[in-house]
Amino acid sequence: MKLKDKVILIINFVTVLFSIFTFIGYLNNLIGFRVVTISLCITIAMTVYLLYKKRKGFLLVYLVYLFLTNFGVFVTNIFLANPLVEYHGDLSWYYINTSNLFSIATFAILTFTILSNFISVFSKETPSIKFDIKSKGNNLFYYTGILFIIGFTIQFLFYILTGRLAIKTYGDYVSSIQELPMYSYGIFFFSIGIAFAFSNVKKTHIKYLVIILTPQVLLFLMTGNRGEVFYPVLSALGVLIVRNYKIKWWMIITFVFTLFFVIPFIKVFRNMDSSSIEKIDINWFSSLVEIGYTLRPLGYVTRWIDGGESIVYGKSYLAPIQNMFSYIIPGLQPVNYEMVGYGFRYRLPGMGFNVIAEAYYNGAIVGVLIVMVLLVLLLWRFTNFKSFEMLSMSTAIVSVLINNIRNAFSFVPVYILIIIAIVIILLFIDSYIKKEMKAD
């Protein structure tokens, strides 16, 4: 091991250890949240660098998004006494329960970070050399991915041009997609397309994928809908890191500039009339707090549990599986989400949900520990598949798991099952094509 690598490992170990001690100090009222937050930010940065060097791309992108969505408000709170200054309505979920929220979110992210570091340092498995970005993967998966991307583009433009999808404001956009059930499946296949394409693309062809994706990305950003961009793009970034793609500094700067300036500008500009353009006021923390607002469901969940509601011991994770089997097993009744405590979309309409909140609702702090450990092990396993076909499947599933960070688990099993079915079909087609080519 080179001296530089040894120094990085030592620094990383020290930052992780310091974060653990500061968190323990916070739990014992010896240290303030600002010290813990700053310490955790440094630890996350060092862990991300280590994961990048070790090509653990899926762990890296999941950790980054998990941190942003659950710590965006706390990071802003370091600089502002009122991080939710741009928000109105009932904010008691944060201000009444801040300490508890901070403790749970810190525990979850610190658990994920510690285990990611442990695996990166002690795991001897590395991504296969044939995955290198200079090599091209499976052609059928690659072109299927492009087909899915183009197919969604056509669907998206059709909905806009026919007036069925309103994009004037984000509110109009959200309202109109409720009336378009096929739109959500289009988004899903769009994310699969990105996963398949980037898992198999050769370095010299990445620019063509960027050109194909640009129209959809711009339209999503203009509507204020960043989720449909972040989920698949983060999974694509993850697989590129697994495939040893070198991230340039200008890419990081462009991402930060887009996140903190371009997107807030679009958001403000789209909600203003021409007479008030000179009054545009963009706050640096707007995007950070908006992403971090995913913390809100955790605030409600802790309130439910503290109010005497019982934890459900994994029932919200088993419910979607039960619903799938209810179609094929006679007498097995599907779960009616409107009648159970874990019908989150009915209890908190329009909020999405939170992966940490759901884990806490199922098993309190032990549930959070179990879910974080399982996620790390799963994402690590996905990194170590030995074929482009399995890598494609892994990347698509990672996109679903990233989506789950800001949503309930209820959709995850069905989406994963669809991905597996598509992969199996493509494997049969690919095998048939290769046999025919050999016969000729």
Model regions and ranges:
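Hydrophobic alpha-helical segments
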Residues: 348-440
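Hydrophobic alpha-helical transmembrane segments
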Residues: 99-112, 179-191, 209-211, 230, 252-254, 296-303, 369-370, ...
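Membrane-embedded catalytic interface detector for glycan/lipid assembly enzymes
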Residues: 27-34, 84-95, 116-243, 260-274, ...
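Hydrophobic, aromatic-rich transmembrane alpha-helices
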Residues: 43-49, 190-201, 370-384, 436-437
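N-terminal "leader" segments that precede or initiate the main folded domain
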Residues: 1-122, 213-216, 232-262, 410-428, ...
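Small-residue-enriched transmembrane helix-hairpin modules in multi-pass membrane proteins
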Residues: 170-177, 262-376
